[in-house]
A protein has these predicted regions:
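RNA pseudouridine synthases
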Residues: 1-183
């Protein structure tokens, strides 16, 4: 959920007031999140006790799809730039993102209402874009949309491989006993 860190707990004093995944469910002791979502992002997060599964999902073989609500009415030219790859900063260096799939969503996606209001229409239009990546640098989607002049206001991961968020509600934890990936 929005406002949670993609870790189960922390012993850090500066993170004492943060929210952690461990507050949502009694996960096994050796559970790990597969990939991360930053505190201001939300959506599908897989959790496993299998390190090989985690490595596979985090590999460049598995697509991750995000819906990004951006500031302004995103243009066809901006979408084309996303598709080709854009320059972002990563670890203090310039990095060109790999080509990706990107499309402007004509309709507002059916997502749960976020607990913290984003803004209202007095500040200008917003639009939604679907971005499908198979890499995942630190805050990559946010940096990509900002680099093309349309900063991200809300970011939701809606798919990892063939696994979709569907009608899950904020904070839902769905246990899967017999899990097979078909990639």
């Amino acid at each position: 959920p929005y406002g949670y860190l993609s870790q189960f707990h922390s012993n850090s004093k500066k993170e004492q007031k943060k929210k952690f995944l461990g507050e949502l469910f009694n996960f096994p002791k050796n559970a790990m999140s597969v990939g991360r979502l930053d505190e201001k992002s939300e959506g599908l997060l897989l959790i496993t006790t299998d390190g090989k599964f985690s490595d596979f999902i985090n590999s460049k073989k598995v697509d991750k799809e995000y819906y990004a609500q951006v500031d302004g009415d995103i243009t066809t030219e901006a979408i084309d730039r996303l598709k080709k790859g854009v320059e972002i900063g990563f670890n203090g260096k310039k990095y060109i993102t790999k080509p990706c799939k990107a499309v402007k969503l004509e309709n507002i996606p059916d997502l749960p209402i976020r607990t913290k209001k984003i803004r209202d229409n007095r500040h200008g239009p917003t639009s939604w874009v679907s971005i499908i990546l198979n890499e995942g640098k630190y805050r990559q989607v946010r940096k990509m949309t900002s680099a093309i002049g349309f900063p991200t206001l809300r970011l939701v991961r809606v798919r990892v491989g063939t696994i979709k968020i569907g009608k899950m509600k904020v904070g839902d934890v769905v246990k899967v006993d017999d899990f097979k990936l078909d990639f």
